[in-house]
Amino acid sequence: MNKQLAAFLRQFESTGSSEADRYLGCHAAEDGFVFRVWAPNAQRISVTGDFNFWNEEDLPMMPVGGGIWEAVSKFAKRGGAYKYCVTGADGTKVYKADPYGNRAMPLPETSSVIDPPEKFRWTDAVYRRNKLRQTSLQRPVNIYEVHAGSWKRHDDGSYLSYTELAEQLI
């Protein structure tokens, strides 16, 4: 078991980990994309998607410890659709979207989309320093709530990305 997995499992098993999405789901890797899912009672899991012509035998996942399964694909591409093919303890096979996926296909499709987050470089050091000098009573309150999935969509029915939503909201 590698150090990253061991550290994640310690946190995940003790608290459920509010940052599980940093390890589970689909992430860019040196040699393609890595897929990880927590399914402690599964007999078998594979990743199936348009990158392997939805062949459930093509990319089997391996159990790596703590109920976590993992597979790496060098053929998967950003924007491609995928699902997990899970064989349960009773032998039943089901196709599941990624519970930690960052994007989903527009309805009625139920696939996840390969769209891992990119590294973001923060440039707000001055703002954060100034913010620490004031109490919350000295700062204005800004509250705006919007449901990202239903507020606005592209003409083809697909969802806006968080970046696209931010451009229109801010």
Predicted regions, residues:
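The feature marks proteins involved in alpha-glucan
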Residues: 1-34, 63-145, 150-157, 164, ...
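Short proline/glycine-enriched turn/loop motifs at strand-loop junctions of beta-rich domains
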Residues: 38-45, 77
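Beta-strand-enriched, solvent-exposed domains that form extended recognition/catalytic surfaces
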Residues: 38-40, 54-56, 71
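A broadly conserved detector of short glycine/acidic/proline-rich loop/turn motifs that flank catalytic sites
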Residues: 39, 51, 147
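Short beta-strand elements bearing conserved aromatic residues within extracellular beta-rich modules
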Residues: 45-47, 82
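Solvent-exposed serine/threonine-rich low-complexity stretches and specific carbohydrate-binding patches
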Residues: 56-64
